[in-house]
Amino acid sequence: MSKCILCGSAENLTEEHIFPDALGGCVVLANGTCATCNSTASTQFEAEFINGFAIVRQLLGIENREGKVPSLKATVEIEGQAHVATIKPEGKIEIPPMKIERQDEAGRKEIIYRTFKKGDAEKIIEKAKSKGIELENAPIADLAREVDAVVHVSLDFIGRQSGLRTAAKAAYAALALKTGVGYALSGTFDTVRNYCRNGGTPTPARLFLNDNFQASFHIGPHQHAIVCAGDAKTKRTHALVIYFGNLFYYVRVSDTYEGADFNWTMACDAQRDEEVKFIVGEYDNEFLMLEDIASGNTHWDDIKASGDYLMRNFSKALGLKFE
């Protein structure tokens, strides 16, 4: 009988995406979570993680469950004033009507409305008329204008509970897919399972950077991956969870593992919505890779450094500019 990997319920089971569906995750654990746990995870941490990657999702053309690529909130400068704008998935910039206040030569206050979309001017005029205000129509030359749209991105979420719990849940769900739900629900994995459900500290998931790993493991900015290994001698099961090729999490899945040794890697292509069967790396196996992270020269829990590394490599791969 299928059961929820988080609470053990056999009622109202739903698909569990190993990597979030809205981030292009295509690997699925059928009947993996109940509707309640699925909804709770989305509300408590996954939604913030997914929404934080809106700019990456738009640039890669990754659709959500409704088949829509996200639009982006941006800032443009027009006539010396900052104004909000929206960047649509196809690259078009939509600017809502803007209100400019200034003084004329006689010291009188002028209010000027600028519109950028057909129909907006008429709506402003009609609204003013309803208030008994007559607006003067002052047409300007129909000139094409170039504006720079600036998108402000905060990556703090990658080191908060939203990022850490999403990574831990991905590692745990992948383990359940590979080893079976019944085994994943055993006491061996209580710690990581309880963290996925309830959060809190200490966390089994951590951000990391490691020069040797970064030089030896190669996937694209459109790919996600999980590397996992269980070692009976050390009683440790641990995993690496990698988003967009350049954001790295280390997850302690269990410190009481006593089963047979195992190691595996799974990956998916977020742009193509398909599982990746072959990953390029210079490690002999997953055991060595994970031990290199756990025991080597690893830089831990640095949100800024991890965020800078992600966006620097993402921009380089796509030929973009990030500051």
Where are these regions (language model features)?
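N- or domain-start disorder-to-order transition segments that initiate the globular core
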Residues: 1-9
